Amino acid sequence: LQEAIAEAKRCLNCKNPSCKKGCPIENHIPEFIHELSKGNMGNAMAIINEKSNLPAICARVCPHEKQCQGHCVLYPKGKGIEIGKLERFVADFDTEMKLIREKLPQKTRGKVAVIGSGPAGLTVAGDLARQGFNVTIFESQAEPGGVLMYGIPEYRLPKQVVRQEIEKIEALGVTFLLNCVVGKQLNIDDIFAQGYDAIFIGSGTALPKSLDIPGAGLRGVIQATYLLHMANIYNEGTVGRDKVPVIEGEHVAVMGCGNVAMDAARTAVRMGAASVTIVYRRTEADMPAIQAEYQAALQEGVKFLWQTSTTEFLGDEDGKVVGLRANTPEGVKEYAFDRICLAVGSRPASRIVSTTEGIETDDNGYVLVKERPFGMTSRKGVFAGGDVVHRPQTVVMAMK
């Protein structure tokens, strides 16, 4: 506590705080830090809650150096306020001490269905519940959380933290329907028929992209999201080690250089891979991953092949991948690998919109929405937000 207060006291409490401008959800950063500096933990948490329903999560996975912290006026001098750590401290303190007891309005403003319980769905559900709406989340998995639960590794985002944040959403009166696949078991029309006044689609981008090159169908070429999902449920004790698609001693390549690629590479290290190499067609400067994750990967022994554009995956006579061929600054080269993970992006699955009339999407399947009323689709009463609307970004961008 004393360390957190001391760090908070370094804040200059700027008149025009650039840190707030750097936050996609415009969190009241100087205000919560000011309360923390005085030891007013409850006030600090209440201020954070005004903008964020998932502070303990954002504090752990946000790219702070690109957002709030990177915009701090002290950052160029190497002395930027550790905003993420302060938010994490306050959120964890609140979880442990249960400081906040919100007075909730009666649920009299209508009935809203939220599809998906990732960052976007949880944020919308929490906000609406606080405003007096009766909210139900339809979730396809056995446990809520979406990408927070199944797509981000335990070492970066402990699942207990996710569960605690979801419990806070439940405490607002939000109901969860689990193992409920919208677009398969029921569609948008069915949900409206159940008496819902509005529907929010926050289903994210569940469909991973592949590479249109020879050998993409070889055995041993897998999606990074699948590796992360299986590793997460293995860590939970739900499946055995044999279900995780990286075998101890394998030489693993990861295609791509975003945060998912870093997560997959570091997970492969933890699964006992003999070597892990990230293959990226651009330079280190072009890398979209968070710098802290890149540095952590380096420290864990992950290697990097820059400006290496893969043209073919190589296989043996049994259809098993054995390596790749790529164009490099030194010419065409071949590299031997036992396993190749694809982390080259994802896009929305069509299951929800294809089973419902009147919801327009672009050519890539992203749901088209209006500015006014904000987030409304081409179908009246149906709204959408998060990664299903824009290309996959960070947790906090999905919340925005």
Label for each model-derived stretch:
Residues 134-137, 141-172, 176, 265-312:
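Rossmann-like dinucleotide-binding cores of NAD(P)H-dependent redox enzymes
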Residues 1-7, 28-60, 77-105, 231:
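Ferredoxin-type iron-sulfur electron-transfer modules in oxidoreductases and energy-metabolism complexes
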Residues 111-136, 261-269:
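N-terminal Rossmann-like FAD-binding beta1-loop-alpha1 element of flavoenzymes
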